[in-house]
Regions:
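Helical "lid/coupling" subdomains associated with nucleotide-phosphate turnover
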Residues: 1-142
């Protein structure tokens, strides 16, 4: 993916987030700690695996971890710097997830920068509702 394409995904995502935020006041809710960012599968599981430097994807190692905003940024930079060939060869990404992962990284980067998230809560993989590792207060879900 070119830098232009990556940045276009960020810009378009932030445009959609602006409309969403204006309608629902998400930024204010995040600042008041009433709203959390939760990632449940896909790109976030890859970010977790790469962050942990796993030799191959291991669901039990990734499930339930949290990654700080600065660490998410570092992992995204690492994945971007791999290039397509590097992502395809990476044991936690591979050829089937390479394109989706880099697109997902752009979307996550858009979320983090748009809402100034410095420490998103992240529950990886299945995020079972009865799991103690899931950082969601289930009483607030409707």
């Amino acid at each position: 993916m070119t830098t232009l394409a990556y940045n276009t995904i960020i810009e378009r995502t932030q445009s959609l987030l602006k409309e969403f935020d204006e309608k629902f006041g998400i930024y204010e809710g995040i600042q008041n700690q009433e709203i959390q960012l939760i990632g449940t599968s896909g790109t976030v599981t890859v970010l977790g695996a790469v962050h942990l430097n796993l030799p191959r994807y291991n669901r039990s190692a990734v499930d339930g971890i949290s990654i700080s905003g600065p660490d998410v940024e570092k992992v995204i930079a690492k994945i971007k710097n791999m290039g397509d060939t590097g992502r395809r060869k990476h044991p936690c990404i591979g050829p089937l997830k390479s394109d989706l992962t880099i697109s997902g990284c752009a979307i996550i980067e858009a979320l983090l920068t748009f809402w100034h998230l410095s420490s998103p809560s992240v529950c990886f993989s299945s995020c079972p509702w009865d799991s103690h590792s899931c950082p969601v207060d289930r009483s607030d879900i409707f």
